[in-house]
Amino acid sequence: MTWRIDYSRDSLEFINKHKLQNKVREELRKFLVVINRGQAPINLKKLEGKWTGYYRLRKGKIRIIFYINKLEKALYIERVDFRGNVYK
């Protein structure tokens, strides 16, 4: 079974505005390959506080905030933004 990736409207707007479709897609693909092997990616962080239950991936100055639904094999991309703005 393959993984499904759903994007919030805000994350899609940021990705399209900055022409980051390929970068984000590639980073998520790498993440899925690593977790399918049972390993933990180095650039992954489990978030706390307001973002409890979400994870963060780093790609340069860009942060990808997402939720993992392992039962449905789905990623929900909540936010994609630059480091200083993503948590606001």
Where do the protein language model's features map onto the residues?
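Enriched for short, Lys/Arg-rich terminal
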Residues: T2-R9, R25, K59-I62, Y67-K88
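Short coil/turn residues that cap or connect secondary-structure elements
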Residues: K19, K23, N36-Q39, W51, ...
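Conserved short hydrophobic interaction patches
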Residues: F31-V34, R83
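A short, surface-exposed loop/turn module that caps and links secondary-structure elements
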Residues: V33-R56
